[in-house]
Amino acid sequence: MGCFSLLCLHNLKDWEGLEKIESDTEYFRVPGLFDKIELTKNQLGNAARPRNEEWRVMSEKMKKAEEEAYGMVVNTFEDLEKEYIEGLMNAKNKKIWTIGPVSLCNKEKQDKAERGNEAAIDEHKCLNWLDSWEQNSVLFVCLGSLSRLSTSQMVELGLGLESSRRPFIWVVRHMSDEFKNWLVEEDFEERVKGQGLLIRGWAPQVLLLSHPSIGAFLTHCGWNSSLEGITAGVAMITWPMFAEQFCNERLIVDVLKTGVRSGIERQVMFGEEEKLGTQVSKDDIKKVIEQVMDEEMEGEMRRKRAKELGEKAKRAMEEEGSSHFNLTQLIQDVTEQAKILKPM
């Protein structure tokens, strides 16, 4: 989680105004932030205030551990959210070391390919496929390793990608039997053969995002994925699912202004995907793809901001960069603290 989302949730946990908001769909302004950020209760779910006993117990344990901690290590970098890093330090009254993006520690192509897990597809096949497309033309779609959509929403997403007529890579970690049947019955993969590549299972995300042909990233807004997209310098379509991901969406869209919302309005809880059904239609998916890949001034400015952030991310991890300095400072601080706490 980044400092922006950590501060969002910190400010909401004890905010009395949250209880006064009767509707789960009413937008309200998050208090105590530098930017105007609006969310709904449906988007927060259990993130700000646990709605059941299991989440409440876990939240209390996390709060206790945080209070006892000497400081916090955060996978982010100063140029990304400087005001929110300082705001979180003041709110928590804790030291914070920002040492990211940690994905940049994987410098070799093989390391990037194997980051997180073993890929379900040969990396050379992916790269050769990407090589066949123009620079900044391909949409990379990946909703994370834990996220699941209803069968109807998966179908709408597939149809939206197809109707956009834009080249895409679609990574699908989880498929219902109904969706597998739909792929076969509709001959979907054959239909999009000249346009899209479907990857079943784990994909080398960091490696693929760094390819020059990638022009945008449709993401679930998990923090690691969000930061990997930022580091790659690409614009994003935000499709948050649960936890703090709606906060991450607001950072990308409203603060950094490098992304476009897909239109998701409520969290998808585990096991309730089919009950929730479809949130975004194929037509709306097509529209948002056109918006993020737009070659007019708005789209160009969005891509320019994204590219500049990607360059700043890389500089942060260099020897003279802020994250490199903070990592050195972390080692020194922990060493000094250990000396103080060492029994005589």
UniProtKB/Swiss-Prot annotation:
Molecular function GO terms recorded: UDP-glucosyltransferase activity
Residue sites binding UDP-alpha-D-glucose per the record: 145, 202-203, 220-228, 242-245
Enzyme's top EC category: transferase
Pfam families on file: UDPGT
GO cellular component: cytoplasm; nucleus
CDD domains: GT1_Gtf-like
Keyword field: Cytoplasm, Glycosyltransferase, Nucleus, Transferase
Domain of life: Eukaryota
Subcellular location(s) of the protein: Cytoplasm; Nucleus
Keyword Cytoplasm: yes
Tissues in which the UniProt entry reports expression: Expressed in flowers and fruits.
Its EC number(s): 2.4.1.-
Function: Probable glucosyltransferase that cannot glycosylate abscisic acid (ABA) and auxin (IAA).
Family: Belongs to the UDP-glycosyltransferase family.
PANTHER family named in the record: GLYCOSYLTRANSFERASE (PTHR48047), UDP-GLYCOSYLTRANSFERASE 73C4 (PTHR48047:SF159)
Protein name (record): UDP-glycosyltransferase 73C4
Source organism (scientific name): Solanum lycopersicum (Tomato)
Gene: UGT73C4
